[in-house]
Amino acid sequence: MARKKLKKRKLLISLFFLVSIPLALFVLATTLSKPIEISKETEEIDEQQVFIDSLSGHAQILYEKYHVLPSITIAQAILESDWGNSELAAKANNLFGVKGNYKGHHVTMETDEVEKGKRKTIRAKFRKYSTFFESMDDHAQLFVRGTSWNKKKYKPVLEAGNYKEAATALQTSGYATDPDYADKISAIVEKYDLDEYDEVNPSLKSVDLNASIKDSAVQDVWSKPSTDDRSIRLTSAQSYVGKDIKVVSKKQKGQSVWYQFQINDKLIGWIDDSAVEIKEAT
């Protein structure tokens, strides 16, 4: 009788292991096969930093030329274009909501305006640009040239000693109708530490070069030179082999030279110059 009970117990134990081990292995395999989920917030923060990195170098180049604070340029681009995702940015490369025509080109779209404390929607013509950089160039020149009726309209923006003064000057000069515009710009600068770009960077140069990625390139493409803090790897250079690229910015740091490039007027990222074959200047 005791032997029968012992056999029965052994049988139950064997059945337990036969069932539980495969089940455990199945659960483990299922868990390992699932991709690691990245929260939407984390992904969004990365995309935002990539957007900032794509504009910061050119904003510093423009600062040296026109004295518009880079923090203001970037913050306005963020606010006005929703991080480059607005319909106006997509259709017209217009980052700042600048109205009118640009070299005969424009798009007509709806926009919200505040008049006598009331918000209303109107249809207006907005300038259409070839690239984001062209939009930034025109934006800086707008502050320099003023308007047809007041050449010094935006002079206080250019003379501002810091981003808070510049944001206030934007508000008082009538750049935007939103009564909270200055506060919104300052808040963006502070949240993303954009004032760290408010200096002339002599290592940065604007260029215009036709080029291609070398077939043998093993380098990566970055949101800004990988030697810089908080640079984000975007993709491998091999993704762009065989495609014509346009080099639009150059940065030298020690013995390293980096190029910012675009394809079909769209900014891509930064890459070490050893991966690039320059064809000719345009």
Curated annotation (Swiss-Prot):
Q: In what way is its activity controlled? A: Inhibited by EDTA.
Which compartments does it reside in?
Secreted, Cell wall
- The residue ranges of the GW domain are 203-281
Query: What's any one GO cellular component for it?
Result: extracellular region
Principal location listed in the UniProt entry: secreted
Q: Name one Pfam family in it.
A: GW
Provide the E.C. number(s) assigned to this enzyme.
3.2.1.-
| Disulfide bridge partners, by residue number | none
Coiled-coil ranges (or none): none
Summarize induction of expression: Expressed under control of sigma-A RNA polymerase.
pH influence on activity: Optimal pH is about 5.7.
Cross-referenced InterPro entries: Glycosyl_Hydrolase_73, GW_dom, GW_dom_sf, MGlyc_endo_b_GlcNAc-like_dom
Alphabetized, the UniProt keywords read: Cell wall, Cell wall biogenesis/degradation, Glycosidase, Hydrolase, Magnesium, Secreted, Signal
Q: Which GO terms describe its biological process?
A: cell wall organization
A single Gene Ontology MF term assigned here is:
amidase activity
Q: Which cofactor does it need?
A: Mg(2+)
Where would one find the signal peptide in this protein? 1-29
Describe the function of this protein: Is the major glucosaminidase responsible for peptidoglycan structural determination during vegetative growth. Catalyzes the hydrolysis of 1,4-beta-linkages between N-acetyl-D-glucosamine and N-acetylmuramic acid residues in peptidoglycan. Acts processively from the ends of the glycan strands. Also plays a role in motility, chemotaxis and cell division.
Can you tell me which family this protein belongs to?
Belongs to the glycosyl hydrolase 73 family.
How is this protein named in the record? Exo-glucosaminidase LytG
| Protein species of origin | Bacillus subtilis (strain 168)
